[in-house]
Each structure stands twice: as structure tokens, then as C-alpha cells.
Swiss-Prot record:
Membrane topology: Multi-pass membrane protein
Name the UniProt record assigns to this protein: 4-hydroxybenzoate octaprenyltransferase
InterPro entries: HB_polyprenyltransferase-like, Prenyltransferase, UbiA_prenyltransferase, UbiA_sf
NCBIfam families: ubiA_proteo
Source organism per UniProt: Vibrio cholerae serotype O1 (strain ATCC 39315 / El Tor Inaba N16961)
Membership in a protein family: Belongs to the UbiA prenyltransferase family.
Pfam families documented for this protein: UbiA
Subcellular localization: Cell inner membrane
């Protein structure tokens, strides 16, 4: 394999841009920490951290495969490996299978409940990239896909699923819809031209308000979750920081400009980090 080909595979998996993996990692850590009520089992932690990066990479590959005929028409994606001809469609599919199988082999080291839940996760990861052709709500499907690590991680740590799991699932789904709508705002003009659907297009002039409502709902449910689990003061400091970051994101997207909207999307990494730190300090 040449250096150019290796670099193309690396870029296809977004290993050069790990923001997506980090946004998937934070809620996974929330679930592990809360299920353990402290530090999770080291083996489970290692499996899920590796699994997050493998499945996020698999999701990026199948997403680019699904979009291979349209990415060349979008300014932000025109130089990705598939539209640039650096990786073939067949090679991308083979890479997706390799990554998905590797993730599944990791899951096989977990308990039966986690293994059963993983089949839904794989299905969501495969289906999501194709949704933008059929519905204006692909961000909702992404929210489900990015949140499915929560019941899986909880099941792996506790071997059961409690009602709090599904509250956390809903919290992350709402947050995901909010930040992926910010991401979709970057490409909205191009997407309208080529017929790609998104919540950014669906929400139209209400986009900023709806993102704000989703962020408010996320924080409100996080407060309710903290009260239900009797989490400590550190948790609420984490939520306060997250609230400040959400306010900053609203400032960034106020004019709907491409780069500030993208910066708002990236800023969500710090939201996830703040909440994770709050949970960790509260349960440790």
C-alpha cells in the first residue's frame, strides 16, 4: 500500500478529524460512569473506547460511500477520498465491513444483553447515511445511532437496563439533533441545490430557535437525571459550563454563516467534555 493510499484510507475514516468520535465517546462515558456509580470495569472501558473509534470510522466510510455521487458537488466535501478518486467504492465497502466486523468482535467479549443490543447499533450505523435522500430528519436517525452506545455501555457494565438509561438516551438524541443541525447549516445552500434533505432545511428561519429549544431540553433533562440519581454539586457545575457553551454557540450561529456554524458544531466537544467531567467528579 502506498503512502497516498494509506493517507486516503486514514482520511476516509476521519482519523484526521476525530470530532465525530469524541462526540460519540462522551455519552458512552456518561453511561459507563453512571452505570458503575464510579469508575467502570477496565475491560469494559477499553472495549467501548476502541469500539467508539472503530464504529465511528465505519460510519464515516459508509456515509462517504452513500454520498459518493454528491460529495463532489459540495464545496466542503469535494476533496474527500471517494469523489477525488483516491479510493474506489469497492475498497470503501470492504473497509466498512472490516471496521464493522472488528467492532462486533470486540462486542462479543461482552455479556449477552450487550451483544443483542449491538445488532440494532450496526443497523442504525448502516441506515443513517441513506436517510438524507428520503427524509428531512436524517439528524433524528443520527441521534438514535449516536445514542445507541448508551444502552450498550450500560448493559455491558451493569448487565441490566434501568429507566435512567432511556432518559440519558433521549438527552443525547436531542443534543445530537441540535449539533448536527448546526453542521447541516454549513452545507445548506449546496444541499438545496442537489436535493439533499436535512433539519437545517426543514427548520428554515426557525433553525436557531429550534436548536435553542433542543439545547434547553437537553439541559433540563440532564438536571432531572442528576436529581433522580442524586448526583453531587460537581455535576451541576458541569451543566453550568455546558449552558454557557450553548449560549456561545447561539452567538456563533446568529448570522448563519458557514464557518461560525461549523465552529459552533465543533464547540460541542467541550459540552460533552464538561458534562463528562461533572459526572466523573460526582460519582468518583
Amino acid at each position: 500500500m502506498t503512502a497516498v493510499k494509506a493517507r486516503a484510507y486514514w482520511q476516509l475514516m476521519r482519523m484526521d478529524r476525530p470530532i465525530g468520535s469524541l462526540l460519540l465517546l462522551w455519552p458512552t462515558l456518561w453511561a459507563l460512569l453512571l452505570a458503575a456509580q464510579g469508575l467502570p470495569d477496565l475491560r469494559v472501558l477499553v472495549v467501548f473506547v476502541l469500539g467508539v473509534f472503530l464504529m465511528r470510522s465505519a460510519g464515516c466510510v459508509i456515509n462517504d460511500y452513500a454520498d459518493r455521487h454528491v460529495d463532489g458537488h459540495v464545496k466542503r466535501t469535494s476533496q474527500r477520498p471517494l469523489p477525488a478518486g483516491l479510493v474506489s467504492a469497492k475498497e470503501a465497502l470492504l473497509l466498512f465491513v472490516l471496521l464493522a466486523v472488528s467492532s462486533f468482535l470486540l462486542v462479543l467479549t461482552m455479556n449477552t444483553l450487550t451483544i443483542q443490543l449491538s445488532f440494532i447499533g450496526i443497523l442504525l450505523a448502516f441506515v443513517y447515511p441513506f436517510m438524507k435522500r428520503f427524509t428531512h430528519l436524517p439528524q433524528l436517525v443520527l441521534g438514535l445511532a449516536f445514542s445507541w452506545s448508551i444502552p450498550m455501555a450500560w448493559a455491558a457494565q451493569a448487565n441490566t437496563l434501568t429507566p435512567q438509561v432511556w432518559v440519558l438516551f433521549l438527552i443525547n438524541a436531542l443534543w445530537t439533533i441540535a449539533y448536527d443541525t448546526q453542521y447541516a447549516m454549513v452545507d445548506r445552500d449546496d444541499d438545496v441545490k442537489i436535493g439533499i434533505k436535512s433539519t437545517a432545511i426543514l427548520f428554515g428561519r426557525w433553525d436557531k430557535r429550534i436548536i435553542g429549544l433542543l439545547q434547553l431540553a437537553t439541559l433540563s433533562l440532564l438536571v432531572a437525571l442528576g436529581q433522580g440519581l442524586a448526583l453531587g454539586t460537581s455535576y451541576y457545575w458541569g451543566l453550568l459550563i455546558a449552558a454557557g457553551l450553548f449560549a456561545y454557540q447561539q452567538h456563533l450561529i446568529r448570522y448563519r454563516e458557514r464557518m461560525p456554524c461549523f465552529q459552533a458544531f465543533l464547540n460541542n466537544n467541550y459540552v460533552g467534555m464538561a458534562i463528562t467531567a461533572g459526572i466523573l467528579l460526582s460519582v468518583w
